[in-house]
Amino acid sequence: IKSKKRYAYTTAATPATLESTINYTYGDSAWGDLLTGYNGKTITSDTIGNMLSDGTWTYTWEHGRELATMSNGSTTWTNTYNADGLRTKRTNGSTTYNYIYNGSSLSQMTVGSNTLYFAYDASGTPMSVTYNGTNYYYATNVQGDVTAILNTSGTAVVQYTYDAWGKILTTTGSMASTLGAHNPLRYRGYVYDTESTLYYLQSRYYDPE
């Protein structure tokens, strides 16, 4: 990808007004497809392709693909992993997320006084979440994106929209600032880290930008 252009929505046959353009650059002599610039920001990486800085955050890594810390100058997040390489905790000293797994599937997350329990179908698609003792149900599209969270009456209390790469465009609904903000399962059912806007895919981290 050399550039990404965003146009206003239209039903016409030709694109509407151009709203934004993001340019990508690749300049590494040893690794031709390694991203070195994004939207005017310089990106640096280590020898195995882990990002070290993106113009906003700086990153440190352990044991290959395990993100150890990330810092934006004022806040540092530190991650902890279990023996299987699954992330079990991330904290910045004042806010702490704790994660529990059933096999490789996230089964429980706690942040502050809020605890969420997750259930999946046989294919691994998220089905339901219990949030502070109340059951809610996920609505997903054909590629597994969580597009809404429903209460037991079938009313959508949270709705998410994404771009084609998983960047969250909107979070709406009567519980957008509570359940909508705390729920980590978003695009393709991946675990979303709100503070960094990265998705945690266990074997790697994914930046939708």
Spell out what each predicted region is.
Residues 24-28, 131-202:
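A motif-centric feature for acidic-aromatic and gly/ser/thr-rich catalytic loops and repeats
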Residues 15-20, 73, 85, 93, ...:
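Residue-level signal for glycine
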Residues 119-131:
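Trp/Tyr-centric glycan-recognition "aromatic platform" motifs on solvent-exposed beta-strand/loop surfaces
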Residues 3-10, 35-41, 52-57, 69-74, ...:
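Beta-turn initiation residues at beta-strand->coil junctions
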Residues 1-37:
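Conserved catalytic cores of ATP-dependent inositol ring kinases
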